Amino acid sequence: MKKTSKKNNNFKIPGTELNSADAERGKEESQRNFVELLPLEVTYKIFSQLDIQSLCRASRTCTGWNCAIRNNDSLWKPHCLTIRAVCQREIDDDIKSGYTWRVILLRNYQKSKVKYEWLSGRYSNIRSPVNLPEKAMCPMDADTWGEILDAELEREVEKLQ
């Protein structure tokens, strides 16, 4: 008489447990991670539609997404060119220095926001440092302050006319 064995669906390896539920969960996780499933060109096209904050959040989602986003400089270039409208000199200097688009964005993003607020006159009528919002300051060189003061002067001249 032949011995028949029952098939064990819960095959155990020390430290791990593999069963049909684990396999199904792994399959679902893989299906949700489009970075691993789609061609890189398609993945980059999807990521290129994200704004700066969403792109940064996506890069923190998992290691695979972080690598895909961090290592593709073309995802960061359009955002750098957008802030270049406010920080042209700074962006151009960083390009000449050979920084990657991602590093250029990291170096200039906060400065561009602060500089834009100053240039647009948001802080024109501040009477005391206490009235400045927390993020109204960042290191700026003399040329940047010169641009801001020129913009203030132009606003004052317009008021007088």
Curated annotation (Swiss-Prot):
Residues 1-25 are annotated as: Disordered. Pfam families: F-box-like (PF12937). Disulfide bonds: none annotated. InterPro entries: F-box-like_dom_sf, F-box_dom. Residues 32-79 form the F-box domain. This is F-box only protein 48. The gene is Fbxo48.
